[in-house]
């Protein structure tokens, strides 16, 4: 029996308040309106950015259905949708691509002006949410809301992917993998034979390492205070691993001494202001490129001496690895299917959706790289 055009009752993980666990609720998901797509979710990754909402570091209206790293199958579409059809395998896009704004038309930029990321409204483009629970509207989260058995997204925030792709793996392309991998191959444009330093060895940091290796870097130095992460970093391409706590001097000085004045490319994948500075200083003063990948704390500012850039350093950042999402996600899935990069080593746990709070405990304790929740 078709559910198209009807309200669907399903389970979702609702965050009602900051610093509280998720609650599995029975919610109602209204049909998609014009230029919207309703998706039956199959799998979703648990990302640090979701936890930033729980802690208040990333501000979005509550109550909300979080989650932004998922994959599923189109259940129905609203009027005017031409990019996908019911039955298509898709990845929702937290970084949309309208194709019409100045940024989408820019050949190098990818942060669509219709993105809900900088100042989250908690709604779709139309101005409301399709979620309700106990008679109350539940907000969306950055165009996606993948912590629900069904979600509704705008058609500018969904990409059709290979129908043979395993959704419990390629869901990582919806955020963490693409963010890290693209930071190396597209944002920094790592060159063959170069030396790289990667600060932070979570799922995104390890994806940076995969990107550096794919780009032909000769040395990839992994930096983390958790030595338990070193084996996985080396498995994925790190040539050396160092712990800042093992040294009496600042880690940037250690890296400068190891690399004849500094690395060619550095990546901060933690989201701390002090490590952003360390990553910048660890790259060569005259030719180094440092990329900010980690999401910094809300409303905190970083001060620095302009002389650090005057000799030729470059300091840059990007959302979603610099990829134009609708264009790039299908290609990244195709590359995965062609075995151009691995995803399996990033997935340390697979849990049923109902165990979402256990997944966040694993994330906060540092015991997981990526936990995938299946519906």
Curated annotation (Swiss-Prot):
Top-level class of the enzyme under EC nomenclature: oxidoreductase
Pfam families per record: ADH_N, ADH_zinc_N
Annotated Zn(2+) 1 binding sites: 47, 68, 175
Localisation: Cytoplasm
EC number of this enzyme: 1.1.1.1
Any GO MF annotation of the entry: all-trans-retinol dehydrogenase (NAD+) activity
Main location: cytoplasm
Tissues where this protein is expressed: Expressed at high levels in the liver, small intestine and eye, at moderate levels in kidney, ovary and uterus, and at low levels in the spinal cord, thymus, heart, stomach mucosa, skin and testis.
Residue stretches spanning the membrane: none
InterPro entries in alphabetical order: ADH-like_C, ADH-like_N, ADH_Zn_CS, GroES-like_sf, NAD(P)-bd_dom_sf, PKS_ER
SMART domains for the chain: PKS_ER
Reaction(s) catalysed (UniProt annotation): a primary alcohol + NAD(+) = an aldehyde + NADH + H(+); a secondary alcohol + NAD(+) = a ketone + NADH + H(+)
Any single GO BP term: response to progesterone
Sites where the protein binds Zn(2+) 2: 98, 101, 104, 112
Residues where NAD(+) binds: 200-205, 224, 229, 293-295, 370
UniProtKB keywords: Acetylation, Cytoplasm, Metal-binding, NAD, Oxidoreductase, Zinc
Residues with the N-acetylserine modification: 2
CDD domains, A to Z: alcohol_DH_class_I_II_IV
UniProt GO cellular component terms: mitochondrion
Keyword Acetylation attributed: yes
PTM annotation (N6-succinyllysine): residues: 234, 340
Alphabetical list of PANTHER family matching this protein: ALCOHOL DEHYDROGENASE, ALCOHOL DEHYDROGENASE 1A
Subunit: Dimer of identical or non-identical chains of three types (A, B, C), which are coded by 3 separate genes at different loci.
Family classification: Belongs to the zinc-containing alcohol dehydrogenase family. Class-I subfamily.
Protein name per its UniProtKB record: Alcohol dehydrogenase 1
Protein encoded by which gene: Adh1
